[in-house]
A protein has these predicted regions:
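Low-complexity, intrinsically disordered segments exposed to solvent
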Residues: 1-161
Length: 161
């Protein structure tokens, strides 16, 4: 199923979200408990304002995302380029690529899997250690040579974003 949004707005008294872009959705069922949902598109923009002020403005380019759910949990894979800005982050441009799909059990955090996030001059590989911890491997020059490694609770990573 294909969708094309042109300035679709969702609004409340204090917030407004604007959606622009294209998205293709695919759905598959391999068994009674095995379901896959995939989203893809060339460009999709989400802009959020609160009381007239910009909260965030994200554009995903060349995106692919899929989630497979079974009775045991689910796996997720994402690949996209993100261009974003907000009052706290100006003109961030990163490429996100799944190295190995993130595997989730009963918890909200993945128990395994890794993704690579590449910016202008550096990259970080984010690897799920378990449902409680995540490891960050920083390549300061973005050449794959690890210059710093840090393991932390998922909550700490989430709060830093």
């Amino acid at each position: 199923m294909q969708f094309q949004f042109t300035k679709l707005s969702l609004a409340s008294e204090t917030e407004m979200m604007l959606l622009d872009g294209d998205m293709t959705t695919r759905y598959g069922q391999s068994s009674a408990v095995g379901i896959t949902v995939a989203l893809s598109g060339d460009a999709f923009r989400t802009r959020l304002e609160k009381n007239g002020a910009l909260v965030m403005d994200h554009t995903m380019l060349g995106f692919e995302s899929s989630v497979t759910t079974t009775i045991a949990g689910h796996t997720a894979s994402r690949n996209y380029t993100l261009s974003t800005s907000s009052p706290s982050v100006r003109d961030l441009y990163v490429v996100v690529k799944t190295i190995t799909p993130l595997v989730y059990g009963a918890d909200a955090n993945p128990v395994s899997g890794s993704i690579l996030v590449t910016g202008a001059a550096s990259s970080v590989t984010i690897t799920a250690v378990d449902a409680a911890s995540v490891r960050l491997d920083l390549s300061a020059r973005g050449d794959g040579v690890i210059t710093e490694t840090r393991t932390m609770p998922w909550r700490e990573l989430e709060q830093s974003l």
